[in-house]
A protein has these predicted regions:
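Short, hinge-like loop/turn segments at secondary-structure boundaries
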Residues: 53-57, 114-117
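Histidine-anchored nucleotide/phosphate-binding helix
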Residues: 19-32, 37
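A charged, amphipathic interaction segment
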Residues: 78-133, 138
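A glycine-rich helix N-cap at a beta->alpha junction
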Residues: 55-86, 90
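Short, glycine-rich nucleotide/cofactor-binding loops
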Residues: 8-18
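N-terminal beta-loop-helix "entrance" segment that forms/cooperates
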Residues: 44-56
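Short internal beta-strands
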Residues: 35-41, 97-99
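Extreme N-terminal starter segment of soluble prokaryotic enzymes
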Residues: 3-7
Length: 138
């Protein structure tokens, strides 16, 4: 299992789900597993240079308690999701690719993306890179 990459399809662009993806990626990278993140639609939008540090809201199920939990996490020293991903890149092999179809639909250019994003690929390339590794959909 250690040889198989952890693959994350990041579809959601809410703060809580981005944080969950970042924690999963950094944990796997720290253990020496390769991590592939494939950014689609709202997940891709979150990686725009002009949005990456913006407050992106919470998932609807977070409800009234969501904002309080985010504040508690920050108070406890939890880094923002994008900072966690930067650390994960330092810890191990983390490859973040933007979905080419999502780029076209959302009219996003590669230069619009934060340097965390390593490139652009199609879904077929993502599956080839995923190999036999697990795929998480967030």
């Amino acid at each position: 299992m250690e040889d198989e990459p952890l693959n994350i399809v990041l579809f959601s662009g809410t703060e809580d789900r981005l944080q969950a993806a970042a924690v999963m990626a950094s944990g796997a990278a720290a253990l020496g597993r390769k991590v592939n993140i494939f950014l689609q639609y709202w997940g891709l939008e979150a990686f725009r240079k002009d949005r990456i540090t913006a407050g992106l809201g919470l998932a609807p199920e977070a409800g009234e308690r969501g904002a309080a939990l985010v504040a508690e996490a920050a108070k406890a020293g939890q880094q923002p999701w994008h900072a966690t991903l930067r650390v994960a890149k330092e810890l191990g092999e983390l490859d973040i690719q933007a979905c080419s179809l999502s780029m076209d639909v959302l009219k996003i250019k590669e230069e619009d993306l934060d340097p965390l994003v390593d490139g652009v690929e199609g879904v077929t390339a993502f599956y080839l890179n995923a190999g036999d590794g697990h795929i998480l959909f967030i």
